[in-house]
Protein backbone atom coordinates (compact mmCIF):
# COMPACT_ATOMS: atom_id res chain seq x y z
CA UNK A 1 0.00 0.00 0.00
CA UNK A 2 1.19 3.51 -0.81
CA UNK A 3 -0.38 6.40 1.07
CA UNK A 4 0.01 9.90 -0.37
CA UNK A 5 -0.83 13.07 1.56
CA UNK A 6 -0.86 16.53 0.02
CA UNK A 7 -1.23 19.36 2.52
CA UNK A 8 -0.69 23.09 2.70
CA UNK A 9 2.26 23.17 5.11
CA UNK A 10 3.40 19.55 5.38
CA UNK A 11 2.73 16.64 7.72
CA UNK A 12 4.98 17.87 10.53
CA UNK A 13 5.94 21.16 12.10
CA UNK A 14 4.09 24.00 13.80
CA UNK A 15 1.84 24.74 10.81
CA UNK A 16 0.82 21.17 10.00
CA UNK A 17 -2.90 20.84 9.58
CA UNK A 18 -3.49 24.49 8.75
CA UNK A 19 -5.50 25.03 5.59
CA UNK A 20 -4.03 26.62 2.51
CA UNK A 21 -4.85 27.12 -1.12
CA UNK A 22 -2.89 28.02 -4.21
CA UNK A 23 -3.28 31.83 -3.96
CA UNK A 24 -2.35 31.83 -0.27
CA UNK A 25 0.74 29.76 -0.99
CA UNK A 26 1.71 32.01 -3.91
CA UNK A 27 1.73 34.88 -1.42
CA UNK A 28 3.30 32.96 1.46
CA UNK A 29 6.14 31.50 -0.64
CA UNK A 30 7.01 34.87 -2.18
CA UNK A 31 5.87 34.16 -5.72
CA UNK A 32 3.47 37.09 -5.71
CA UNK A 33 6.29 39.43 -4.62
CA UNK A 34 8.13 38.87 -7.90
CA UNK A 35 5.13 38.67 -10.24
CA UNK A 36 3.90 41.72 -12.12
CA UNK A 37 5.48 45.07 -12.85
CA UNK A 38 7.76 47.15 -10.64
CA UNK A 39 5.75 49.51 -8.45
CA UNK A 40 2.48 47.59 -8.82
CA UNK A 41 0.74 45.54 -6.14
CA UNK A 42 1.68 41.84 -5.84
CA UNK A 43 0.09 39.71 -8.54
CA UNK A 44 -1.17 36.14 -8.36
CA UNK A 45 -0.05 33.90 -11.20
CA UNK A 46 -3.32 33.22 -12.99
CA UNK A 47 -2.83 29.46 -13.28
CA UNK A 48 -2.85 27.28 -10.18
CA UNK A 49 0.81 26.41 -10.51
CA UNK A 50 1.22 25.45 -6.86
CA UNK A 51 -1.76 23.09 -6.83
CA UNK A 52 -0.68 21.50 -10.11
CA UNK A 53 2.99 21.39 -9.14
CA UNK A 54 2.21 19.73 -5.82
CA UNK A 55 0.21 17.11 -7.69
CA UNK A 56 3.16 16.49 -9.99
CA UNK A 57 5.60 16.14 -7.06
CA UNK A 58 3.17 13.76 -5.35
CA UNK A 59 2.88 11.71 -8.54
CA UNK A 60 6.67 11.46 -8.79
CA UNK A 61 6.80 10.38 -5.17
CA UNK A 62 4.15 7.73 -5.78
CA UNK A 63 6.02 6.41 -8.82
CA UNK A 64 9.27 6.24 -6.84
CA UNK A 65 7.40 4.53 -3.99
CA UNK A 66 5.98 1.96 -6.43
CA UNK A 67 9.54 1.04 -7.41
CA UNK A 68 10.50 0.69 -3.76
CA UNK A 69 7.40 -1.39 -2.96
CA UNK A 70 8.27 -3.70 -5.87
CA UNK A 71 11.80 -4.05 -4.53
CA UNK A 72 11.03 -4.47 -0.81
CA UNK A 73 7.37 -5.46 -0.58
CA UNK A 74 6.94 -2.78 2.10
CA UNK A 75 4.30 -0.05 1.87
CA UNK A 76 5.29 3.59 1.90
CA UNK A 77 3.99 7.03 2.77
CA UNK A 78 4.55 9.90 0.34
CA UNK A 79 3.95 13.55 1.11
CA UNK A 80 3.92 16.84 -0.75
CA UNK A 81 3.11 20.28 0.54
CA UNK A 82 1.88 23.36 -1.27
CA UNK A 83 4.39 25.52 0.61
CA UNK A 84 7.35 23.36 -0.41
CA UNK A 85 6.19 23.56 -4.02
CA UNK A 86 5.95 27.35 -3.84
CA UNK A 87 9.35 27.71 -2.21
CA UNK A 88 10.75 25.29 -4.79
CA UNK A 89 9.56 27.54 -7.62
CA UNK A 90 11.48 30.40 -5.96
CA UNK A 91 14.91 28.71 -6.04
CA UNK A 92 16.38 31.01 -8.73
CA UNK A 93 15.34 34.08 -6.74
CA UNK A 94 16.63 32.64 -3.47
CA UNK A 95 19.96 31.65 -5.03
CA UNK A 96 20.34 35.08 -6.62
CA UNK A 97 19.61 36.79 -3.31
CA UNK A 98 22.10 34.59 -1.47
CA UNK A 99 24.78 35.24 -4.10
CA UNK A 100 24.28 39.00 -4.41
CA UNK A 101 22.45 40.13 -1.29
CA UNK A 102 19.96 41.90 -3.55
CA UNK A 103 16.28 41.26 -3.02
CA UNK A 104 14.45 39.99 -6.09
CA UNK A 105 12.18 42.48 -7.77
CA UNK A 106 9.33 42.47 -10.22
CA UNK A 107 10.39 42.57 -13.85
CA UNK A 108 7.12 42.21 -15.71
CA UNK A 109 7.67 39.60 -18.40
CA UNK A 110 11.47 40.02 -18.43
CA UNK A 111 13.97 37.50 -17.15
CA UNK A 112 16.56 39.00 -14.79
CA UNK A 113 19.61 37.22 -16.17
CA UNK A 114 18.92 37.25 -19.91
CA UNK A 115 18.13 39.97 -22.45
CA UNK A 116 16.15 40.23 -24.57
CA UNK A 117 13.79 37.77 -22.92
CA UNK A 118 10.46 39.55 -22.59
CA UNK A 119 7.33 40.89 -24.25
CA UNK A 120 7.50 43.53 -26.97
CA UNK A 121 4.64 45.53 -28.44
CA UNK A 122 3.79 44.62 -32.05
CA UNK A 123 1.48 46.61 -34.30
CA UNK A 124 -1.44 44.33 -33.45
CA UNK A 125 -0.61 42.86 -30.06
CA UNK A 126 2.38 41.46 -28.26
CA UNK A 127 5.28 39.16 -29.11
CA UNK A 128 7.63 37.41 -26.70
CA UNK A 129 11.27 37.43 -27.78
CA UNK A 130 13.53 34.97 -25.98
CA UNK A 131 17.15 35.26 -27.08
CA UNK A 132 18.66 32.99 -24.46
CA UNK A 133 22.23 33.21 -25.75
CA UNK A 134 24.47 35.25 -28.05
CA UNK A 135 23.80 33.06 -31.10
CA UNK A 136 20.05 33.42 -30.70
CA UNK A 137 20.42 37.18 -30.23
CA UNK A 138 22.19 37.41 -33.59
CA UNK A 139 19.40 35.37 -35.20
CA UNK A 140 16.68 37.53 -33.63
CA UNK A 141 18.42 40.68 -34.84
CA UNK A 142 18.70 39.25 -38.34
CA UNK A 143 15.01 38.31 -38.38
CA UNK A 144 14.09 41.84 -37.27
CA UNK A 145 16.46 43.56 -39.73
CA UNK A 146 18.50 44.85 -36.80
CA UNK A 147 21.79 43.22 -37.80
CA UNK A 148 23.77 46.19 -36.47
CA UNK A 149 22.81 45.55 -32.84
CA UNK A 150 25.15 42.59 -32.10
CA UNK A 151 28.10 44.72 -33.27
CA UNK A 152 27.22 47.44 -30.74
CA UNK A 153 29.47 46.84 -27.71
CA UNK A 154 26.51 47.49 -25.38
CA UNK A 155 24.83 44.38 -26.79
CA UNK A 156 27.76 42.12 -27.76
CA UNK A 157 27.26 39.70 -24.86
CA UNK A 158 24.33 38.73 -22.70
CA UNK A 159 25.88 40.40 -19.66
CA UNK A 160 26.16 43.65 -21.61
CA UNK A 161 22.61 43.30 -22.93
CA UNK A 162 21.30 42.81 -19.39
CA UNK A 163 23.23 45.89 -18.26
CA UNK A 164 21.72 47.93 -21.13
CA UNK A 165 18.31 46.21 -21.11
CA UNK A 166 16.23 49.40 -21.19
CA UNK A 167 17.99 50.83 -24.26
CA UNK A 168 17.90 47.45 -26.00
CA UNK A 169 14.19 47.09 -25.30
CA UNK A 170 13.47 50.50 -26.83
CA UNK A 171 15.50 49.69 -29.96
CA UNK A 172 13.86 46.30 -30.49
CA UNK A 173 10.38 47.61 -29.76
CA UNK A 174 10.80 50.44 -32.27
CA UNK A 175 11.06 47.67 -34.84
CA UNK A 176 8.45 45.24 -33.46
CA UNK A 177 5.84 48.02 -33.37
CA UNK A 178 6.10 48.16 -37.19
CA UNK A 179 5.39 44.43 -37.52
CA UNK A 180 2.42 42.25 -36.70
CA UNK A 181 2.85 39.68 -33.96
CA UNK A 182 2.73 36.94 -36.62
CA UNK A 183 5.55 38.55 -38.60
Predicted regions and their residues:
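Active-site-adjacent "lid/gating" segments in soluble enzymes
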Residues: 1-127, 131-132
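Aromatic-enriched alpha-helical interface/lid elements that frame and gate functional surfaces
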Residues: 115-183
